[in-house]
From Swiss-Prot:
UniProt protein name: Serine/threonine-protein phosphatase
Organism whose genome encodes this protein: Escherichia phage lambda
Record's keyword annotation contains Hydrolase: yes
Residues where Mn(2+) 1 binds: D20, H22, D49
Disulfide-bond pairs as recorded: none
Signal peptide (UniProt feature, chain positions): none
GO function terms (MF aspect): bis(5'-nucleosyl)-tetraphosphatase (symmetrical) activity; metal ion binding; protein serine/threonine phosphatase activity
CDD domains referenced in this protein's UniProt entry, alphabetically: MPP_PrpA_PrpB
Location of the active site: H76
Record-level GO BP terms: RNA decapping
Length: 221
């Protein structure tokens, strides 16, 4: 399992971070058209959960093959990887929206298996350095009070933990040291949430069509 990946923002014009897609490929493409995304100059980083619950799961999974797209591993990628492995728990995945895979035709199933294998290479944490700012992108949480690139982490905490956001919503807000901004998904909300230097950008695209993109580099950031 890959834990950390570092991205040098100077290689790109504009950079956006997108919330949980959950198979909402057309919604994303429409958003990218609206913002004038240029796949030769710009970069899109996903907070994970590309698949499950929505209708266009293979299309969303295929995004990880494109050079203009990066993603961290979400709990739904992990359930897919585990469910398709020999020792995996397929029922856990099915209960959480994985049924789409078992309704694919033969060709799409072969493609989805290959993409799931590639998804097993996704990092848990992306560090983006953009000019003088450091952004850390994880699916659910960075489970420490201070960030350090390469620090050992419990992968289950990174992709599942809701303790920090729960505390923040109850008024117990703590900054995470070591980076300027932390961007998470995983916990759906009506609008993006911000507590101290943490942003939560899962706005329930698969439930209500509201997909959030946050620009972190370029004009408008």
């Amino acid at each position: 399992m890959r834990y950390y990946e570092k991205i040098d923002g100077s290689k790109y014009r504009n950079i956006w971070v997108v919330g949980d897609l959950h198979g909402c490929y057309t919604n994303l493409m429409n958003k990218l058209d609206t913002i004038g995304f240029d796949n030769k100059k710009d970069l899109l980083i996903s907070v994970g959960d590309l698949v499950d619950r929505g209708a266009e799961n293979v299309e969303c999974l295929e995004l990880i093959t494109f050079p203009w797209f990066r993603a961290v591993r979400g709990n739904h990628e992990q359930m897919m990887i585990d469910g398709l492995s020999e020792r995996g728990n397929v029922n856990h995945w099915l209960l959480n929206g994985g049924g789409w895979f078992f309704n694919l035709d033969y060709d799409k199933e072969i493609l989805a298996k290959a993409l799931a294998h590639k998804a097993d290479e996704l990092p848990l944490i992306i560090e983006l350095v953009s000019k003088d700012k450091k952004y850390v992108i994880c699916h659910a949480d960075y489970p420490f009070d201070e960030y350090e690139f390469g620090k050992p982490v419990d992968h289950q905490q990174v992709i599942w933990n809701r303790e920090r956001i729960s505390n923040s919503q109850n008024g117990i807000v703590k900054e995470i040291k070591g980076a300027d901004t932390f961007i998470f998904g995983h916990t759906p909300a009506v609008k993006p949430l911000k507590f101290a230097n943490q942003m939560y950008i899962d706005t329930g695209a698969v439930f209500c069509g509201n997909l959030t993109l946050i620009q972190v580099q370029g004009e408008g950031a």
